[in-house]
Regions:
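Bacterial N-terminal signal peptides that target proteins for export
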Residues: 1-10
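Aromatic- and glycine-rich peptidoglycan recognition patches
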Residues: 89-151
């Protein structure tokens, strides 16, 4: 009986953390975006911008289901990609992405409806900040290369 209760608790924990009845999977951002997006690219996240040339439309304005491409940095050597989930206003969007921060549940977790704000001087989404839910504040500015549209 104890074993059955522990097994049920573990399955429930997997459901709570992942939104499904399967155990939590550790994702990187590229795996996640490739899985949920119509944009089918691979390799380092920051390289998606150039890889999309000639295959997908690219631009500087967010749209639902577009892929936001973050440039690489010394701390984020592979860059980052995320899916635009919703448009809040001209300067704020919500994204779904994976493996952004360690947070409460460890690396590789999927975060949904995370706010991102455009902090670029020209309002062209070349510099963005990501909302840190745990600390309830905006993070540091990151260079964004743009949006890839699945069309």
């Amino acid at each position: 009986l104890l074993f059955r209760n522990v097994a049920i608790a573990l399955v429930a924990a997997g459901f709570i953390f992942t939104g499904s009845a399967s155990p939590a999977k550790a994702w990187n951002c590229v795996q996640f975006v490739h899985q949920v997006s119509a944009v089918k690219l691979s390799g380092d996240a920051w390289r998606w911008w150039s890889a999309a040339l000639g295959r997908y439309e690219r631009g500087k304005q967010p749209e639902r289901k577009a892929v936001l491409v973050f440039d690489h940095t010394s701390r984020m050597v592979h860059g980052h990609v995320a899916i635009v989930a919703d448009l809040v206003n001209k300067r704020i969007i919500q994204i779904d992405h994976a493996n952004w921060s360690i947070g409460r549940f460890g690396r590789g977790q999927i975060a949904r409806n995370v706010r991102v704000q455009d902090v670029s001087e020209k309002n062209d989404w070349t510099s963005v900040e990501v909302w840190n839910e745990l600390d309830q504040c905006w993070g540091r500015p990151y260079k964004a290369l743009g949006f890839i549209y699945a069309r």
